[in-house]
Structure formats: C-alpha cells, structure tokens
Amino acid sequence: MQLFHLCLIISCTCPTVQASKLCLGWLWGMDIDPYKEFGATVELLSFLPSDFFPSVRDLLDTASALYREALESPEHCSPHHTALRQAILCWGELMTLATWVGNNLEDPASRDLVVNYVNTNMGLKIRQLLWFRISYLTFGRETVLEYLVSFGVWIRTPPAYRPPNAPILSTLPETTVVRRRDRGRSPRRRTPSPRRRRSQSPRRRRSQSRESQC
C-alpha cells in the first residue's frame, strides 16, 4: 500500500495523476463519506460482505444497460445519475493509473502488489459505490435504505435467533406494497362518514337555496 501511494504522489508523472488524486481522495482514507448525502453511511454499507457485490465489469454492464441514455445525456437527470457518472469515470482513471504504474515498475513483485491492492481495496469500494447508485436508481431511496438496515440487523443477530436466509433487495418492494395496502385499510373503515356528509350536503344546499330565496 505504501509503495502504491509513493508511486502516485512522488514518482508518477502521468497526466492522469491530478485527476486521479481528486477523484480518489476518499479512497485514500480521507474523511469523506459519499453516502451521507443520500441517507446512508459507509458503516451501513460495510455490513454487506465483499462477495455480495458483483464485479465492476458486471456493474458497469448493468449501468449501461439500464441508464446508458441518461448517463450519456448532457442534461442533469438526478444527483444519483451524476454520482454514477463520476464513479464510472473514477474507475476508468484508476485503471489507467494502475496500468501506468504497473508498466513502469520493473520489479514483478511490486507490480503484483499494485494490482492486488487496486483490486482488493479500491476495487471493493468502487463496487460498493456502483452497487449503491444503481440500486438507488432501480429500487428507490426508501427500499435501499430499508434493505441496508434489515441486512445489518440480520447479520448482527446470532444465527440461532435469525432466519436462515438474508433479506433480498428485489423482494422488499413487494413487502412495501403490502404494508401500504395494510395502511390503506383504515380509510375503508371510515367510509360511513363520507356517506353521511354526502347525505347532509343536499340539506345544506336546500337551506342555502331557501336563504337565497328569502
């Protein structure tokens, strides 16, 4: 890790260094949480295991298949579209930088160290970031946050007291719909009150008409 940072800050002279420093600031340990603006935190994402997140290639293919038109559009669609664009560009800059550093390191061991560090540490953070942006756009804020909280509660509960399977994000919208239907039952019980109001409305109209006639 120290070798990689040393190559970036001191020895590296490629033109993408400054851009990479800016876009990778939070990856280098700065106190920047890219999820706070959207109601989540790095700690909340950390409850999800590393093997939960798809590969960067699969996430990029998913983003392209679902939101390519919006991502390539010059117009501002939403803060999450902008954040997704930045994450994709950030990964591209990181790959360019890692390739440059790897090609300029003569020691094979140092080269492997750079590649492994990028794939394990920085790659995981990019996978988390891409997954969060895509899930937010696909399922919505409330569903994603509810899933993160539900998974966090599940993973921290002892195995003897929790369900065998972890929560699934794609099933939460169905649960949300059921809850909304349950909440919608209360107005149905109050249906007599509108009927009474309707029955009273003609009387009021008649009284008003009599007063107008007078």
Swiss-Prot record:
Residues 186-214 form a propeptide. It is found in: Secreted; Host nucleus. GO terms for cellular component: extracellular region; host cell; host cell cytoplasm; host cell nucleus; T=4 icosahedral viral capsid. Phosphorylated. GO terms for biological process: microtubule-dependent intracellular transport of viral material towards nucleus; symbiont entry into host cell; viral penetration into host nucleus. Keywords: Disulfide bond, Host nucleus, Host-virus interaction, Repeat, Secreted, Signal, Viral immunoevasion. The record marks R185, S186 as: Cleavage. Residues 178-207 have a biased composition (Basic residues). Sequence repeats lie at residues 186-192, 193-200, 201-208. Residues 25-27 are annotated as: HBEAG. Residues 165-214 are annotated as: Disordered. SUPFAM superfamilies: Hepatitis B viral capsid (hbcag) (SSF47852). Residues 186-208 are annotated as: 3 X 8 AA repeats of S-P-R-R-R-R-S-Q. Pfam families: Hep_core_N, Hepatitis_core. Residues 1-19 form the signal peptide. HAMAP family: HBV_HBEAG. May regulate immune response to the intracellular capsid in acting as a T-cell tolerogen, by having an immunoregulatory effect which prevents destruction of infected cells by cytotoxic T-cells. This immune regulation may predispose to chronicity during perinatal infections and prevent severe liver injury during adult infections. Belongs to the orthohepadnavirus precore antigen family. Homodimerizes. This is External core antigen.
